[in-house]
Amino acid sequence: MKDINNNFINTKNKPNQADYLEISQTLANFHATCFTNSKNRYSKKSMLFFLENPFYHIFYNQISLAIIQVTSEEAELITLAVESKQRKKGIGCNLLKSIILHLESIDIKNLFLEVAVTNKIALKLYDKVGFITCGLRKGYYGQGTNKKADAIIMTYAIVTGITKTLKSDKKKLQNLYPSG
C-alpha cells in the first residue's frame, strides 16, 4: 500500500486503484476513532467514494483528517477529525490553514461547513480561523434517541490578501500536508 501518512491526496496525487480499498479502510478506521460517540462516522464505502471522486480532496496524516468537496468556486468541509490525544495542540487550526491555502491556489472563493450547535470545541476552532456564521439548519444532526441538534452554517471568504497572513506559515503547513 502506498504510504498515505503526511500526505494530501488529490487528483494529481491519488494512489493507484489497487490501493483504494486498503486506504479507504484506513481512513474509515481513523475517522471512527475520532468520532467514537457519534453517528457521524464515515464508512469504508463512503471513504472509497471520496477517494474515487475528483471533486473531493482529502488531507490525511497519522493524527488528522479532513475531506473537502470542491466545485467551481466553492468548497465544503465535509469532515475534520483530529485524534483525541492530539486535540488542543493547534493541529486542527493548522489543517484548516493548509486547506484554505490549497483552496486559494485553485481559485476557490468560499469554504463552507456545518457544525452542530453543541460542538463548542469545533465552533471555537472555526471562529479562531476566521469563519463567520451565515445560517442555521434546524434538526440537522441526529443525536441518537430521536433528538436532533441544529447545525450552524459557517463560511470563510478566500480572498487574496485575507489569506496573506496564512502564507507566513506556508512552509510549516506544507511540511504537515505536502501538496505533492
Sequence positions of predicted segments:
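Acetyl-CoA-dependent GNAT
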Residues: 9-14, 21-87, 93-98, 102, ...
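Short amphipathic helical patch at the helix-1/turn junction of helix-turn-helix
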Residues: 82, 116-117
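Helix-adjacent hinge/juxtasegments
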Residues: 89-90, 114
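Short glycine/proline-centered loop/turn elements that form peptide/ligand docking sites
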Residues: 92, 96, 119-122, 139-145
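Conserved GNAT acetyl-CoA-binding A-motif
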Residues: 103-114
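Conserved catalytic-core motifs of GNAT/GCN5-like acyltransferases
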Residues: 114, 127, 132-149
